[in-house]
Amino acid sequence: MTEPDEEAVALAHTLFQAARDGDTALLRSYLNAGAPATMTNAAGDSLLMLAAYHGHAEAVQLILKHGGEANSANDRGQTPLAGAAFKGYTDVARVLLDAGADPDAGSPSARAAAQMFARTQILDLLGQ
């Protein structure tokens, strides 16, 4: 069995943390250098999912610009839009919707999450 490349693992951890923190400068640097915007962690969470779930609209926009997939689901079937709806991040939801995110994709869908947690501003964006 091949051992994982320690430098690659460290870089991945750095990028995932940058997405969680909304560190757009660091993300931009690595994405411009060719880091894949679609990379996922062990739970299937993409950079986009982590940025969306933690409420970083600018980072979400940056990742989308570099090829992040608005409707990609993690291993639990959750999409970035569902994460934003669950947490009530209207600005993030707007960015994702503008990029073509499907409010009915995933399980639970963004629409279902917004209804479940009474996120009325998100529901308004989704057209209920």
Could you tell me what each predicted segment is?
Residues 1-33, 42-45, 128:
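Intrinsically disordered, low-complexity regulatory segments in ankyrin-centric signaling systems
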Residues 11, 44, 77, 107-110:
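Start-of-repeat signature of ankyrin repeats
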Residues 26, 58-59, 91-92, 121-122:
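Conserved ankyrin/ankyrin-like repeat signature
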Residues 28-36, 61-69, 94-102, 127-128:
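Ankyrin repeat domain, specifically the short helix-to-loop turn at the C-terminus of the second helix
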Residues 38-40, 70-73, 103-106:
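Ankyrin repeat boundary signal
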Residues 93, 97, 102-128:
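Leucine-rich solenoid repeat scaffolds
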